[in-house]
């Protein structure tokens, strides 16, 4: 079983230059307020970008405001403690662990869990190095259920 890195090639192409398109009529402050209100409604940062693209016609938040969605949330003190990609991987690991409790002989899922947890450890190392997670933060599957 390979580490699945080649999946998901489809997706919209990013604009070649980071400039505000002419058709976007919203001011940067309005876009920032939209980002904050969507986050308060419970949408994660990745979904906020998709919603702004699909429903409001804003192709890239950074092109309009000069800041990414996470930068806007950090300025307002709203950014999540644990980065979204890491949280999603941890939720996946919890689901696989729960499955393995019921089906302990499922060796394919055991291997999948190993791959997921390896990816978690690599991400944690990166986030500690970048200062996003505290240096003493540790991935412990038993305690992670409290975060999710």
From Swiss-Prot:
The keyword Transmembrane does not apply. InterPro entries: Ribosomal_uS15, Ribosomal_uS15_arc_euk, Ribosomal_uS15_N, uS15_NS1_RNA-bd_sf. Residues 1-23 are annotated as: Disordered. GO terms for biological process: translation. Coiled coil: none annotated. GO terms for cellular component: cytosolic small ribosomal subunit. It comes from the Archaea. Signal peptide: none annotated. One of its GO terms (molecular function) is structural constituent of ribosome. Keywords: Ribonucleoprotein, Ribosomal protein. It holds the Pfam family Ribosomal_S13_N. Part of the 30S ribosomal subunit. Belongs to the universal ribosomal protein uS15 family. This is Small ribosomal subunit protein uS15. It comes from Thermofilum pendens (strain DSM 2475 / Hrk 5). The gene is rps15.
